[in-house]
């Protein structure tokens, strides 16, 4: 009897391993086939989603000195300021326009969802699948995200941590994208309040975990068993960023070099794991450390992001009732590749430019507007002393050139912090 039990257990383990291996092979094949189309943002490290910048068309590299910008502009470490964020939380919902716009039948997706719920879709969630599938469309897109961050600046030293979870879609399927990023850096500044040069350098540990793509129907009928058998790719990279900024009275200019890969540390190496194995494999700090070592040594998939050069200029009156104007050019190094690929010069250049303005009406109220790759954005913030609330309705370009794949979103952030 003991032998029979042993053989049975061995068969069960073998079958489960074969099943998991098959699932992982399919997942890896999907990554290879759609690396640049559907998974590029998931494979790369965390990029800050700052409603202040979103409301200004994605611009503000030279003037945005919030703790969020520590993830994208290390030169803020040369300002010599002290700042705490404990914490900030951001919620973003996409496809807002698609949700409320009227179709050929005179009804919006929101109208159809409300009607379906009244007719019993709450009991049969599958009735909502066609509506949701039509809403997210084809190609790559995002549905919603939540994130939280904490951080501090202490003169020339800064550190921050961010957790972001985004539900993405690609060709009618959906998948979860979780990112955890910790950044630490040093900077220095030369000059005074009117004329100043700031330089900063940061290192980041970016941990990415994203699931295999599943159908909308499966996503809307999730249960514990389905979740436990869902495979995730999990990996991390350690990229470095450098930034320099120059201030001359009200004029400011900033340049950053991000995703610098030193000694291969910036390569993202991935292993694959089932959800049900997470609690058993990652149940302690030692276990996490051991798994992290295994991922780097025995990775099944590797992604190397390209280094990015960004530049921004701005005009900032630095007064409580003043105005800020900003213009950025992002990912400059990829522009020649896009032009060589045959894309139009106008579309490529417009797709890499961001511009915006911020008007401070009072000490506590700001209004923003801008153009993000040609799409109009707007936003604002209210400072209540103990908490700052930022909101933005924005459009962003998910394609290579302006006008290829626009996506809108509504973002709201609450920040409890102290600034000096």
Predicted regions and their residues:
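Short glycine/proline- and aromatic-enriched beta-strand/turn motifs that initiate or cap beta-hairpins
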Residues: 21-69, 75, 84-109
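Sec/Tat signal peptide C-region and signal peptidase I cleavage site
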Residues: 15-20
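N-terminal functional module of multi-domain proteins
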Residues: 64-67, 74-190, 199
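Sec-dependent signal peptide recognition
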Residues: 2-10
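Outer-membrane beta-barrel porins/channels
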Residues: 21-53, 134-420
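Short hydrophobic/aromatic segments of transmembrane alpha-helices and their interfaces
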Residues: 3, 59-61, 65-66, 245-246, ...
